[in-house]
Amino acid sequence: MAATGALGSVLCVLTGASRGFGRTLAHLLCPRLLPGSTLLLVSRTEEALKGLAGELAHKYPGVRVRWEAADLGTSEGVSAAVRAAGELQVGAAQKLLIINNAGSIGDVSKMFVDFSDPKEVTDYMMFNVSSPLCLTASLLKTFPRRPDLQRVVVNVSSLAALQPFKSWALYCSGKAARDMIFRVLAEEEKDVRVLNYAPGPLDTDMHVVARTQTADPELRRFLMDRKEKGKMVDIQVSAKKMLDLLEADAYKSGDHIDFFD
């Protein structure tokens, strides 16, 4: 079990926080933060954010929990999230932690040849590629390098970043692009610790879409089989592993680490 406050005094920005892996991360992250730390929750869904923030504030009164309802699929949403973070005081924080968890699977009912509408592809890439790049870049400028502040960036990745899957053209390309973006960040900014973490197959809303709507019948059967045979990864176990990796701080910056590694 992780020691209380093991991650130190942290200013954390967590996207995609209102459900699934992000919500689980928020609950498991708070006890690892020292009192006085700040957690900014970002998601599209205002009511879910309010509820989560209330739960965390009640359970972990030492952590300042803030939230911002923002659609990261738009430039305005990215700007709103950056403004909300900029209003926070880094103060005595020892660490800036940016967790890029927000993402979508796209229309997996289509095969490659069905993507003939550039706007559909552009909108997908805006939310899944452009927004984490621009959000992270803006936050790193908002909280620049200083001797007493460690800056850490996490990209929630996937096996799909490394391996092609039929009918997942958008998802695979988006995840691959995100991995490379953050690998470049690791090369350019040597003081920033960067982790691409693939949490494994989780029983979330996204996986429901994948196993029911994927166009390729073989892949759809494979995903359904994993669910029926209980081969999904426990979401809390995966979130804990990610936080353990951050706590140990022994990974090579920019590396892609899978839950099964």
From Swiss-Prot:
Subcellular localization, as worded in the UniProt entry: Cytoplasm
Quaternary structure, from the entry: Homodimer.
Matches recorded under InterPro entries: Biopterin_syn/organic_redct, NAD(P)-bd_dom_sf, SDR_fam, Sepiapterin_red
Function of the protein: Catalyzes the final one or two reductions in tetra-hydrobiopterin biosynthesis to form 5,6,7,8-tetrahydrobiopterin.
Keyword Transmembrane helix set for record: no
Family the entry assigns: Belongs to the sepiapterin reductase family.
Record-given protein name: Sepiapterin reductase
Principal cellular location given in the protein's record: cytoplasm
Catalytic activity from the UniProt record: L-erythro-7,8-dihydrobiopterin + NADP(+) = L-sepiapterin + NADPH + H(+); (6R)-L-erythro-5,6,7,8-tetrahydrobiopterin + 2 NADP(+) = 6-pyruvoyl-5,6,7,8-tetrahydropterin + 2 NADPH + 2 H(+)
Pfam families: adh_short
GO molecular function per UniProt: sepiapterin reductase (NADP+) activity
UniProtKB keywords: Cytoplasm, NADP, Oxidoreductase
Originating organism: Xenopus tropicalis (Western clawed frog)
Signal sequence bounds: none
UniProt: substrate binding residues: 158-159, 171, 200, 258
Any Gene Ontology biological process: tetrahydrobiopterin biosynthetic process
Keyword Calcium among UniProt keywords: no
Binding of NADP(+), residues: 16-22, 44-45, 71-72, 175, 202-207
EC annotation from Swiss-Prot or TrEMBL: 1.1.1.153
Domain of life assignment: Eukaryota
Gene Ontology CC annotations of this record: cytoplasm
NCBIfam families for this protein: sepiapter_red (TIGR01500)
